[in-house]
Amino acid sequence: MPSTTQTTVQSIDSIDSIPTTIKRRQNDKTKTPKTKPVSKIPICPKNSSIPRLDQPSQHKFILLQSLLPITVHQLTTLVLSISRYDDYVHPFLLRLCVIIGYGYAFRFLLRREGLAIRTLGKKLGYLDGDHHPRDKVPRDSTRLNWSLPLTVGSRTVMCVLVAYDPSQQPINYLASLKWWAWLAVYLSLYPIILDFYYYCVHRAWHEVPCLWRFHRRHHTIKRPSILFTAYADSEQELFDIVGTPLLTFFTLKALHLPMDFYTWWICIQYIAYTEVMGHSGLRIYTTPPISCSWLLQRFGVELVIEDHDLHHRQGYRQARNYGKQTRIWDRLFGTCADRIETNPVNIQKGRRVMMHSINIPSLGN
């Protein structure tokens, strides 16, 4: 038998004979992996101060991105020297191109808003954060994967098929001061009328027992985030995505206030922005960017993020705050809930956050 000394020498010789590349791999395995620093989300007591999100900066954020596809649309017609589209392109192909272009722009706006909200959340925290974090994505999350494409695609197709007129170029509207004045009017009328239809059906889902099954999935989330904005049963998705916009469009038409394609497109972007912001749970005081927001605040019927957040935390029959754009109908029908964190005592009037000043990461991050 070889001695212990000989065995040790052989072991040392065998180690020395290992190629340097293998040694490096072994050394790399022993090294502790580098971990990225985790940014802690601030947890704020419910009685601590809360900042305001500037209203004009939200209009700037939405309008600039809403006008982007309209501008590209107009430039395309100028480059191709097309005065009347029907003479050059088949109407079906033309509408298909419009759907693709505006659909991509819709998705771009929502993703940028989502990134801005995520950035704000890391700095300011979330509502009810001292009690419970935001709910995580459930295991059965397949609906979340196609909820955004479904919303974007359905509303864009609806808008193009119902209101798009190929014979009218965007410049025919954008160059008119009257059109801009009416746009400001529609940015008040459209969300208020839409909110009436949503309030009625939403309240019925809660108070009529046989209708609750169409709304149950959306309420499995008690502390929502932007991912759960369109997380719902198929019946609710159909009503939210195309039902209320169509009812509002034809109501305005019946009132002799018809909307052109570009006005409706911009109004839809405003509605989608408010829907996402309302499910964000951000610990910030802000109202939906409605052109008459100052008037709603004067009468105490403005909506804030906490209103819908409290609605999700309440039970099946105990829920209140059914509105999603304003508090007009909740106030009229006595279904308002008291605010906890965004009460006037906590609001910091001197501390404002601007949407355009948020350092939004690139879409690839």
From Swiss-Prot:
It is a multi-pass membrane protein. The keyword Cell wall biogenesis/degradation does not apply. One of its GO terms (cellular component) is membrane. Keywords: Glycoprotein, Membrane, Oxidoreductase, Transmembrane, Transmembrane helix, Virulence. The gene is vlmA. Residues 20-41 are annotated as: Disordered. Glycans are attached at N47. Pathway: Secondary metabolite biosynthesis. It comes from the Eukaryota. Disruption phenotype: Leads to complete loss of verlamelin production. It is an enzyme of class 1 (oxidoreductase). The chain crosses the membrane at residues 62-82, 89-109, 144-164, 179-199. Its EC number is 1.-.-.-. It holds the Pfam family FA_hydroxylase. One of its GO terms (biological process) is lipid biosynthetic process. Belongs to the sterol desaturase family. TMEM195 subfamily. Residues 189-335 form the Fatty acid hydroxylase domain. GO terms for molecular function: iron ion binding; oxidoreductase activity. InterPro entries: Fatty_acid_hydroxylase, Sterol_Desaturase_Related. This is Fatty acid hydroxylase vlmA. Its main location: membrane. It is found in: Membrane. Fatty acid hydroxylase; part of the gene cluster that mediates the biosynthesis of verlamelin, a lipopeptide that exhibits antifungal activity against plant pathogenic fungi. Verlamelin is a cyclic hexadepsipeptide and is bridged by ester bonding between a 5-hydroxytetradecanoic acid moiety and a carboxyl group on the terminal Val of amide-bonded tetradecanoyl-hexapeptide D-allo-Thr-D-Ala-L-Pro-L-Gln-D-Tyr-L-Val. VlmA and vlmB are altogether regarded as essential components in the biosynthesis of 5-hydroxytetradecanoic acid.
